[in-house]
Amino acid sequence: MPHRAASPAVSENEFDITGALFQNDSDSDNEQPSAKSKRQPPKKAFIAEQQTSANRKASNLKGRTVKKGGGFQAMGLSANLLKAIARKGFSVPTPIQRKTIPVIMDDQDVVGMARTGSGKTAAFVIPMIEKLKSHSTKVGARGLVLSPSRELALQTLKVVKELGRGTDLKSVLLVGGDSLEEQFAMIAGNPDIIIATPGRFLHLKVEMNLDLSSIRYVVFDEADRLFEMGFAAQLTEILHGLPANRQTLLFSATLPKSLVEFARAGLQEPTLVRLDTESKISPDLQNAFFSVKSSEKEGALLYILHEVIKMPTGPTEVSQQRKEEDASAKNLKNKKRKRAEMEKAVNTRESPTKHSTIVFAATKHHVDYLYSLLCEAGFAVSYVYGSLDQTARKIQVQNFRTGMTNILVVTDVAARGIDIPILANVINYDFPSQPKIFVHRVGRTARAGRKGWSYSLVRDADAPYLLDLQLFLGRRLVVGREFGDQVNFAEDVVTGSLPRDGLSQSCEWVTKVLDDNADLAAQRTVAAKGEKLYMRTRNAASLESAKRSKQVVSSDNWTSVHPLFQDETSNLEAEREKMLARIGGYRPPETIFEVNNRRMGKHENVDALDTIKRVRSTLESKKKPFSDEDDDVPTGVADNMSMASDSELEVTFSSYSKSKDNKAKKASAASFQNPEYFMSYTPNNTSLAEDRAYGVHSGTNSNFAQASRSATMDLAGDDGGRGFGEARTLMRWDKRHKKYVARQNDEDGSKGTRLVRGESGAKIAASFRSGRFDAWKRENRLGRLPRVAISGKRFRHRKEQAPKKADPLRGDYEKMKKKAELAKERAMSKAGGAAPRGKSELKSTDDIRIARKLKQKRREKNARPSRKK
């Protein structure tokens, strides 16, 4: 048999590999190669380029392996779920999904830090669908998702429906405002996934006496907002009813202390997942800090927007384009567009403008005031704060995301869940009281290799917080123009003042607007009152930074022009600024009474003059000790504060705390404790900067307590009060009972009515047990609902029939006859071996009575005489 020729097929890159394939495995040496292809062989350079591009994913040109990017296919998901993910449009998992999904699939409890828009909903929905797989006939839900608002719950339900399209999982939505009877029917329908708000779900749990022992997968979505809205008691009660072998997930934008305590109590050895990009300052971010006075903050904000950022006034280009499109659509008869044009329009609308700026304010009163002021100045502005209505909040954020507005004025509480993909600038109108809050604010810009700027307004009272931030970042402090041109805005903390001419014009414009607009002036008054409360409730700066800030503020460089305006300000302007600064800080050595007496030569009011001199001498004597202490501090403020190591901070803070008490110092010197062997109950290498801050470097978080300590951050409430997580002791007057009652009753929905203790010991409203579920069961003629973990009804064949008689016309008549006889015997043996039961011979009293009546009738009939013919 002749040997066949080798395969004529060539490789993908027209490279013949038959020789390599059949070199050692050929049957004979007489095998003839196939004819060459008519196409000419390509050049070697082209072959090398194709091979390099084919192998680029596995290795680079230097030979070192390249880490492959993990996709959804590498996570071990089912085929139906992968199809649903592809249908949804997810091609590559987001960073939070890539880090969270594998941990969840390993049945570990997770605390994830993610903002709204980062893909966190799919991060917990995809593993939930993969774990539940299909509908279970056993009674009881297996998945529970708790959301803070109705809108977020609807969004989660939509994602669950879309990703679970290839399964038969049943999901229900239980939120406030819907009919309780309809929700009773939903729960009675044995759903697999429950998406609810805490208040309504707790109401249904108490009303229906639900058994939550079947829950295996629990998600607390936007947990920080859940605690802020006063759902702590409801969450504790719900958590008490869940089984111990559940898997709990907690997603939040920030980690307040109360949330960390809740996670420690409700989660079992959780894993903290947070992105390094959310805890670092980008190296592409440039920072500028401007020293201003309290009365100049509005003018400084307007000057930064006009002169530094070059923010255009009037409607944005996107809003004008949309108005033109709407006008053209009305004129056109055919309003349908091509698919490509629609996608192009959507893509352009979903990107903010190049001037997009976020302005952070302290309270919601500041947000309202700045919104009105900036709108008066002609800017396109959006605003968001914590207590804003959810629909209005969504509209305002969407306008900023799509480029309808250029400026977004927010508070820290409201901005923690907002994710803006492209952001150019961040302005800190009110300087943050913690370094972590500053990192959280400015982390929204300079992403994905883009450049970004942050501008901060620093008053004299904010200088200690600025020094805390400088110590936390470990960067050099540059005050004014003391270093000349050698300034790096991305690596240094550069401070200085704004040019006086432009700032004065902006301040004059603000003063004029406040005089003309009474509503704006009233808003400023309210904001000032809110600021007083905010100042009392914000965290205090470190004592060492407060001490150093006095020297920094009193220096001449503090009021000098910022190096950012070096090209715009000449030397003459710099001298003018110095002269104005000296005039502004001038204090006369004598009062007007002393000057007049010296000029006129009179000696009136001698007692008053002596009192003034005595007070002045007393103040000067008190200033001398402080000046002596300041002499011990080196003159180079920036050099002294630029690179402070941990050992320096330890020595500085420990010596400062010990110098207050000389007796304690003597006692420690004469103490019997040997420092070489004595172990203190407190760590001796902690510094205040480390306690208030967290390590921004990446690392493994093996212990949740340690990891959460580095990520914990409490935000002050945007209404001027304390942040969530602290007990409110406010009372209100109850008109009906004529007494003061706790306002906590209003938050849990009881409105001052009676509270009862739940299963966990927490107080819940007594109105949750109203009896409506019992009435619903009576209306629908339902008895007791099936117990949890009991399977549903399954059909089983229990009917018994007599065997058919064998057909004598069939060929297997004898065989079928024997089968019928055997079936009869089995039926008789199953009945106890006796023959089929006949009519019982024992008569009852009724049978006997009836029989007697019938017999008597027969007798009477038979005893009648016969008829005569």
Curated annotation (Swiss-Prot):
Ranges of Basic and acidic residues composition bias in the record = 800-828, 838-850
Q: In its UniProt record, which GO terms are filed under biological process?
A: rRNA processing
Please state the protein's primary subcellular location: nucleus
Where in or outside the cell it occurs: the entry states: Nucleus, Nucleolus
Boundaries of every Helicase C-terminal domain copy: 341-495
Q: GO terms for CC?
A: nucleolus
The reactions it catalyses are:
ATP + H2O = ADP + phosphate + H(+)
Compositionally biased intervals (Basic residues): 851-869
Q: State where composition is biased (Polar residues).
A: 21-35
The residues forming the signal peptide are none
Q: Annotated motif DEAD box: location in the chain? A: 221-224
Entry's EC annotation: 3.6.4.13
UniProt short sequence motif Q motif, positions renumbered to this chain: 70-98
Q: Give the InterPro entries listed for this entry.
A: DBP10_C, DDX54/DBP10_DEAD-box_helicase, DEAD/DEAH_box_helicase_dom, DEAD_box_RNA_helicase, Helicase_ATP-bd, Helicase_C-like, P-loop_NTPase, RNA-helicase_DEAD-box_CS
Q: Which GO terms describe its molecular function?
A: ATP binding; ATP hydrolysis activity; RNA binding; RNA helicase activity
* Record region (Disordered): 1-43, 315-348, 792-869
The entry's ATP-binding residues are A114, R115, T116, G117, S118, G119, K120, T121
Q: Supply the alphabetized keyword list.
A: ATP-binding, Helicase, Hydrolase, Nucleotide-binding, Nucleus, Ribosome biogenesis, RNA-binding, rRNA processing
* Domain spans labelled Helicase ATP-binding: 101-273
Q: Which domain of life is it from?
A: Eukaryota
Under the heading PANTHER family, the entry gives: ATP-DEPENDENT RNA HELICASE RHLE-RELATED, RNA HELICASE
- Give the UniProt family note: Belongs to the DEAD box helicase family. DDX54/DBP10 subfamily.
Q: According to its record, what is known about the domains?
A: The Q motif is unique to and characteristic of the DEAD box family of RNA helicases and controls ATP binding and hydrolysis.
Q: What is this protein called?
A: ATP-dependent RNA helicase dbp10
Gene name for this UniProt entry? dbp10
